[in-house]
Amino acid sequence: MSDNAPAPKKPARNNGAVVMMCLSFVFGMGAMSYAAVPLYRIFCQVTGYNGTTQRVDQVSSVVLDRTMRVTFDANVAPGLQWDFKPVEREVNPKIGETIQVHFTAENRSNETQRGQAVFNVTPGEAGVYFNKVQCFCFTETDLKPGEKLDMPVVFYIDPEIVKAVESKDIHTVTLSYTFYPKEGPKPLALNEGGAVKSEKKL
């Protein structure tokens, strides 16, 4: 009588289940990557991470007897033929004081261009305390050929900045903007009478 017992049979692999698992993994990773950008943006807005400023609807009710030096930086990414710069290079508002500054943008190309401003604050620890009430960066900007636009920014520094360990010794912050080209339908050109110009078909 042989002592060699027959080897147990391996259960048949369910190929369908394996395929479904692989597909679920692929679709799951795709969904995560798609959601990563908006989730990261929300995270930055809530925490001020990476110098992201805050958008608010109300001004501060507290104004401290201490000033903060705020400098401004303006840049234009390739693809936009714009002259973009701050009117005021720096201001020294009291912490908690609401203040308005201005930037100008001029389209030096021969066509209408659309841009979107991206912003940040340095040092990054100050971002969560830099509150913007009004800003051209909240919307896209269209400029016709040769058009020049005055763009105000209304902001204040949250008084809480002097209480946080990581930010209480900050005395200068820089608000920086970069305009990037934004794709989208361009506004229809108008003739001198204000009517939409019709395109000639060949």
Swiss-Prot record:
Q: Does the keyword Aminoacyl-tRNA synthetase apply?
A: no
Its membrane topology is listed as: Single-pass type II membrane protein
Q: Where does this protein chiefly localize?
A: membrane
Keyword DNA damage applies: no
Entry superkingdom: Bacteria
User: What is the annotated role of this protein in its UniProt record?
Assistant: Exerts its effect at some terminal stage of cytochrome c oxidase synthesis, probably by being involved in the insertion of the copper B into subunit I.
Q: Which PANTHER family match?
A: CYTOCHROME C OXIDASE ASSEMBLY PROTEIN COX11, MITOCHONDRIAL-RELATED, CYTOCHROME C OXIDASE ASSEMBLY PROTEIN COX11-RELATED
Assigned protein family: Belongs to the COX11/CtaG family.
Name of the protein: Cytochrome c oxidase assembly protein CtaG
